[in-house]
Design a protein with these regions (language model features):
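Peripheral/terminal regions associated with large enzymatic or DNA-binding modules
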Residues: 1-19, 23-226
Length: 226
């Protein structure tokens, strides 16, 4: 697996930016990478930082729009594969888990389509790793990478579903990063906002509520009261 091999280069380095050949980057991607790494370097809940920003729930086929809360980033239990950043600690936390030869089964709380991905998909296992360990990726509200969806290994036909607007501010932007503990903008592996975030925003719901606005969750896997 190419990404596993790339991640293992962190044996020699402290931090890593992974860009596949079909990614197009913002001129400021490195500035964001440096500043976000500096800010989240010691946050134990963060499993990686994304340069991409999803507008499409890829494993279900619906539009996704995170809440705009005045910050430049939010958190999601979805691994990024269209431009991602890892520290040595983040990568080898995953790798130690991966080396136990985990299996993905029908009862795992990850999107159903993800479960059908090939066994050599690193992303499939990173999904499960994040859910099992309650970890999150940091995502920018405005992307620093995009993908043109040209025909190739992953796209048998040209597609535009991964094309997004990319950031193009003046250099030296001061980013407004939220602390994980204080953020009310966190999403689960099904691109659904966490109930505690809605409660903090004033919505009167039980903390043990299963949020399934897009209808992608196999509800028999969830034992929530609501």
């Amino acid at each position: 697996n190419h990404i596993i091999s790339c991640g293992d280069l962190l044996n020699k380095f402290e931090r890593q930016i992974v860009l596949e050949e079909d990614c197009f980057v913002s001129p400021n991607y490195y500035d964001f990478a440096f500043k976000s790494l500096t800010f989240y370097n010691t946050e134990k809940k963060v499993a990686g930082i994304s340069l991409y920003s999803y507008l499409y729930y890829e494993s279900f086929g619906t539009v996704f729009t995170p809440l705009i809360d005045g910050y430049d980033t939010y958190f999601m239990q979805v691994p990024s594969s269209l431009g991602q950043i890892w520290t040595k600690e983040q990568w080898f936390g995953f790798k130690a888990w991966y080396n136990t030869n985990p299996e993905i089964g029908e009862n795992d709380k990850i999107p159903e389509k993800v479960k059908t991905w090939p066994e050599n998909s690193w992303k499939k296992y990173f999904y499960k790793y994040m859910v099992e360990n309650d970890l999150f990726f940091v995502y920018p509200h405005i992307a620093f990478t995009t993908n043109f969806g040209d025909t190739g290994t992953h796209f048998p036909e040209k597609t535009q579903i991964y094309q997004v607007n990319i950031e193009y501010y003046e250099k030296g932007k001061s980013y407004n990063f939220p602390q994980f503990a204080n953020s009310n903008n966190k999403y689960d592996s099904y691109f659904e906002i966490l109930p505690q975030c809605l409660i903090k925003r004033g919505l009167k719901i039980d903390p043990d509520t299963c949020i399934d606005i897009m209808g992608s969750k196999p509800l028999h896997l969830f034992t929530n009261i609501y």
